[in-house]
């Protein structure tokens, strides 16, 4: 199967059953390729296209035919030489034929005919009579339907359709893998962000305890406790929202992995083993990236194959404008035998070709009795509007597809530029978010020290705690977005499979 996946990326072969499903990103991708329904559905299309090639090739399969008939005739005759006047005859025939169409357009037939005839006519020299004939018939088109390319055009198109199906399959795999990566990092972010929100609750509760202690000793007004308790409740609500987001991302990932939600695996929580990394690589070369995308993109290669099909169809339709001019030829060998009967008035004589059925075949293949015929058949449809219209449609469809390809090329350039720009933007976001997070930590630390000596309020401390939690979440989001922007670039360049050393079987087929 051409679209079978070859996975050589390291990882666990199957999900390991523990209290949680501990999965690295490569584990998740391996499981997705193994179980994803969308990939399996697309794979069926490649199998269908492969069978369609066989269907088109079957046009050149030979046909073996065997025909057997028996008939009886009873006729009246007015001939003075017929005896008796009521003629009765019984005929049995058994014919074998073998015919085939060859790829240049040649059609041939080998035919072997055998007949036995028995009659009550007294003028039959052989009764019963055995007739044998071997015949070869040839038809060779010279204009319309002539040539390998014309007669194999449907096969060429079917093979291109298989390639198109493989491109669709590869595109689906890239799409599913990219979606899997994004969902995985969404889950990682939601889990890490939960820690941030929980830490924010801990800070608020710690401040609440400190405020309560100061209220009890009379250094703060009771209103400060209400402020602290209100903030704790607000942050606990954020934790609840974070839990909900985790569950959503868990379900999304299980759905991609095709894990039933009521199965033992589906009832467990997925625990990602990978953390998002901020690895600054060399700047993206737009020129090289565009060339890579044009070379690799399955949707672009699919359009090119479709264009090839249009050219093949146009060439075939152009051939159909030609008149039919066929050379026809036939060559036959024949022989007879049977039981010799005396025939003749007034002196009866015997037919010299008497003998058994086998003798009839011997005479046939001796080559002494033969026939041949040769000639041509010429046909020209007046007007020929159907063929002209089909050719015009082919040319219009080709021009339309060329414009579509040009438009896709522009789209690819735009997508590559956007993906490269997004990486650079997210890199700057991470750098800025890190600075902002560090400053928020310093601001909170300074404000807490002021609070300890009575130079700040709980409101200010809570506000700085909120700022720190927001900056920590922003930094996490920026790092995840940076990793997702690299996913997008790989998808746009169609290098996703190479990243995980995933090969299509069609990539290694001759």
Listing of model-derived features with the role each one plays in the protein:
Residues 190, 204, 303, 310, ...:
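Generic beta-strand/beta-sheet core signal
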Residues 436-486:
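C-terminal structured "cap/appendage" subdomains that terminate the fold
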Residues 1-91, 138-153, 157-159, 184, ...:
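Bacterial Sec-pathway N-terminal export signals of envelope proteins
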Residues 16-20, 68-136, 272-282, 315, ...:
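Small/polar, glycine/serine/threonine/aspartate-rich low-complexity segments that form flexible
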Residues 40-44, 48, 57, 103-131, ...:
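Sec/SRP-type N-terminal targeting helices
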Residues 1, 12, 74, 253-264, ...:
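Acidic, low-complexity, intrinsically disordered peripheral segments
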Residues 166-289, 422, 426, 446-449, ...:
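Periplasmic alpha-helical coiled-coil/stalk elements that build and connect Gram-negative outer-membrane
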């Amino acid at each position: 199967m051409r679209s079978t996946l070859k996975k050589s990326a390291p990882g666990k072969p199957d999900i390991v059953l523990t209290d949680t499903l501990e999965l690295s990103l490569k584990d998740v991708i391996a499981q997705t390729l193994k179980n994803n329904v969308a990939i399996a559905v697309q794979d069926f299309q490649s199998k269908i296209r492969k069978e369609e090639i066989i269907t088109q090739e079957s046009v050149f399969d030979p046909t073996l035919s065997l025909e057997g008939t028996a008939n009886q005739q009873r006729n009246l005759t007015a001939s003075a030489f017929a005896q008796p006047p009521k003629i009765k005859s019984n005929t049995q025939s058994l014919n074998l034929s073998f015919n085939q169409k060859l790829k240049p357009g040649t059609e041939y037939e080998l035919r072997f005919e055998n007949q036995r005839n028995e009659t009550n006519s007294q003028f039959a020299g052989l009764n019963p009579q055995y007739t044998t004939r071997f015949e070869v018939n040839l038809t060779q088109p010279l204009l319309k339907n002539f040539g390998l390319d014309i007669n194999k055009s449907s096969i060429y198109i079917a093979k291109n359709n298989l390639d198109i199906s493989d491109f669709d399959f590869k595109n689906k795999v890239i799409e599913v893998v990219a979606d899997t990566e994004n969902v995985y990092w969404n889950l990682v972010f939601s889990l890490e962000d939960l820690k941030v929100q929980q830490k924010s609750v801990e800070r608020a509760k710690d401040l609440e305890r400190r405020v309560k202690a100061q209220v009890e000793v009379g250094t703060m007004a009771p209103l400060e406790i209400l402020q602290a308790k209100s903030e704790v409740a607000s942050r606990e609500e954020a934790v609840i929202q974070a839990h909900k987001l985790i569950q959503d991302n868990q379900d999304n990932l299980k759905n991609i992995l095709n894990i039933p939600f009521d199965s033992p695996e589906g009832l467990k929580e997925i625990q990602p083993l990978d953390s998002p990394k901020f690895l600054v690589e060399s700047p993206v070369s737009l020129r090289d990236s565009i060339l890579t995308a044009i070379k690799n993109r399955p949707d672009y290669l699919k359009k090119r194959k479709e264009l090839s099909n249009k050219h093949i169809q146009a060439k075939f339709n152009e051939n159909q404008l030609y008149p039919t001019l066929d050379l026809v030829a036939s060559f036959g060998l024949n022989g007879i035998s049977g039981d010799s009967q005396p025939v003749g008035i007034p002196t009866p004589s015997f037919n010299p070709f008497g003998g058994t059925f086998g003798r009839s075949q011997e005479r046939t293949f001796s080559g002494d009795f033969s026939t041949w015929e040769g000639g041509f058949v010429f046909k020209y449809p007046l007007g020929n509007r159907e063929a002209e219209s089909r050719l015009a449609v082919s040319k219009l469809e080709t021009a339309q597809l060329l414009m579509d390809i040009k438009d896709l090329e522009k789209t690819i350039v735009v997508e590559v530029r956007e993906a490269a720009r997004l990486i650079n933007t997210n890199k700057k976001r991470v750098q800025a978010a890190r600075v902002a997070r560090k400053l928020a930590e310093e601001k909170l630390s300074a404000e807490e020290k002021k609070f300890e000596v009575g130079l700040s309020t709980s409101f200010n401390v809570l506000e700085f705690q909120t700022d720190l939690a927001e900056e920590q979440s922003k930094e996490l989001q920026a790092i995840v977005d940076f990793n997702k922007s690299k996913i997008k670039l790989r998808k746009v360049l169609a290098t996703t499979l190479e990243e995980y050393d995933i090969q299509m079987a069609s990539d290694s087929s001759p």
